[in-house]
Amino acid sequence: MLLSKINSLAHLRAAPCNDLHATKLAPGKEKEPLESQYQVGPLLGSGGFGSVYSGIRVADNLPVAIKHVEKDRISDWGELPNGTRVPMEVVLLKKVSSDFSGVIRLLDWFERPDSFVLILERPEPVQDLFDFITERGALQEDLARGFFWQVLEAVRHCHNCGVLHRDIKDENILIDLSRGEIKLIDFGSGALLKDTVYTDFDGTRVYSPPEWIRYHRYHGRSAAVWSLGILLYDMVCGDIPFEHDEEIIKGQVFFRQTVSSECQHLIKWCLSLRPSDRPSFEEIRNHPWMQGDLLPQAASEIHLHSLSPGSSK
């Protein structure tokens, strides 16, 4: 039963971060060719980031995602400890990849003359949160709480590793339907976490905070909390609260569904117009709504019956 599995994950905490010096991947030219190690399957998706294909690791039949990123589309570069110049996305993924299950793991990477290829874990069966909500509508609060807790822990893990995701949204959250676990994906808009102000943003505008819309400036932690507020609203109402810049700047939240007063309070707190008024991660974790119980298994089984074949057994 998926919901009971989600409940069992509530104890999870951010894991130690990966030490870049401890696991150095050799430059692509020193490896066996990608084609000899991975079998490339159908296209999963494409966009400004490049293209992602399903795949299988030949050695053990492990399902993987194979992401191709063209070099001329890469605007932010980083450097590994061995001096290799790579997309910042590779640097960030290597920093957050660990035994912590809430963030997608980078398994390998390859450099080609005109592109980079990233090999990422691919859980099965899986569905992103956008499609999950689109198919089912607004989520019951117990289910939303289970997902939101895991997203919060994933974002905390990233920050503990010195990584700012900068594109927290439903499309970047995968739900492993067999385990009830979420995974935060797509670090292509991310950056190294810093205490000073950011003046660039490449994430999704309707999840961006009002200070970015008005002043093109924001601090990483408070902007992440704003995005979490948008995400929680999306879960319990079935859609995002703001579509246009003027709505983001006003920050007036209207609830389209029946939502408990405690959940409303948490959402509005995260969506405070002044960044300094927003809660910290610890305050979110300790909020009364986050301490609520999940539905009994019988009720949740009805709610989640259509998740996937056998997932509610």
Swiss-Prot record:
UniProt-listed SUPFAM superfamilies: Protein kinase-like (PK-like)
Null mutant phenotype: Deficient mice are viable and fertile however they have a specific defect in interleukin-7 (IL7)-driven growth of pre-B cells, as well as IL3-dependent growth of bone marrow-derived mast cells. Triple knockout mice PIM1/PIM2/PIM3 are viable and fertile too, but their body size is reduced at birth and throughout postnatal life due to a reduction in the number of cells rather than cell size.
Substrates-to-products reaction catalysed: L-seryl-[protein] + ATP = O-phospho-L-seryl-[protein] + ADP + H(+); L-threonyl-[protein] + ATP = O-phospho-L-threonyl-[protein] + ADP + H(+)
GO annotation (BP), single: protein phosphorylation
Residues recorded with modification Phosphothreonine: 23
Residues in Protein kinase domain copies: 38-290
Active-site residues from the entry: 167 (proton acceptor)
InterPro entries tied to this protein: Kinase-like_dom_sf, PIM1/2/3, PIM_Ser/Thr_kinase, Prot_kinase_dom, Protein_kinase_ATP_BS, Ser/Thr_kinase_AS
Keyword Kinase: yes
GO molecular function (one): manganese ion binding
Subunit structure: Interacts with RP9. Interacts with HSP90AA1, this interaction stabilizes PIM1 protein levels. Interacts (ubiquitinated form) with HSP70 and promotes its proteasomal degradation.
Function description: Proto-oncogene with serine/threonine kinase activity involved in cell survival and cell proliferation and thus providing a selective advantage in tumorigenesis. Exerts its oncogenic activity through: the regulation of MYC transcriptional activity, the regulation of cell cycle progression and by phosphorylation and inhibition of proapoptotic proteins (BAD, MAP3K5, FOXO3). Phosphorylation of MYC leads to an increase of MYC protein stability and thereby an increase of transcriptional activity.
Protein name: Serine/threonine-protein kinase pim-1
Organism this protein belongs to: Mus musculus
Organism lineage string: Eukaryota, Metazoa, Chordata, Craniata, Vertebrata
